[in-house]
C-alpha cells in the first residue's frame, strides 16, 4: 500500500484523483454561464440516470401510474462528467451542484427542490401518494428514507469509489467500505425477512430511495464485479424485494426514460 504523509495544509492537486479528477474542486458555486431549457410541463427535472437520479424518475413514473396528471414533467440531462452541474442556471436551482434537481412551476412562484430525498418527500406530500397519513407509519417511512440518505454515501462514495473508480486499488479503504456495505446489506436483508416492503405492508418513497441504490446493487447494475465480491446472492430477502420492485411498470419505465439535451 502507498504511504501518504499529510502536509500541514492541504491543497488540491490536478493529478491522481481518479475518474472524476477533471471536475472535482474544493470550492462551490457556478463556473460558467449556462441557461437551462424549460418545457411546458408543471415539473422541470434536471437529472441523470444515476441511483439518485433514478429515485426521482421512479417517483414521477409511479405518480403517472397512479393517474396524477399534475405530476407531468420535462426531464433534462445534466451530464456530470461534462460539468453541466456547475452552470449558472443549474446552480441557481441547486447551489450544491448535484443531481437531481427539480423546479416546480405549478405554483405562483416556482419552487426549487434539491437533494433526492427532499424531492421524494416533496412530491409525496404535494400529491398525497406513496407516504402514509398515519403519523406512526409516516415516521417509519421517514426513518428509512433518511437512513438511505445517510447510509448510501458509504456505498457510493466509499465502496464504489475505491472498488471501481480510484486510480489504484488499495486494500484498506476497500476492506473498510466493503465491511460497512455488507453490514448495510445484512440490515436490509433482516428487515425484509418478514415484510414485503421496508416500512411495512405498503410500497413507499422509502422503497424507491433504497431500491435505487441497494436494489440496483443487488441487480449487479452499479459496479462491475460487485455482485460476486459482496456475495450478494446470499441476501435472499433483499433479492426478493429487489425483484418485487423491479417488476413494477413504473420502475421499468423509469429505467428507460429519455433525458432531453440541455444544449
From Swiss-Prot:
The keyword Ligase does not apply. Residues 44-131 form the GST N-terminal domain. Gene3D superfamilies: 1.20.1050.10, Glutaredoxin. It holds the Pfam family GST_C_2. Keywords: Transferase. CDD domains: GST_N_Ure2p_like. Part of the SMU_1296-SMU_1298 operon. This is Uncharacterized GST-like protein SMU_1296.
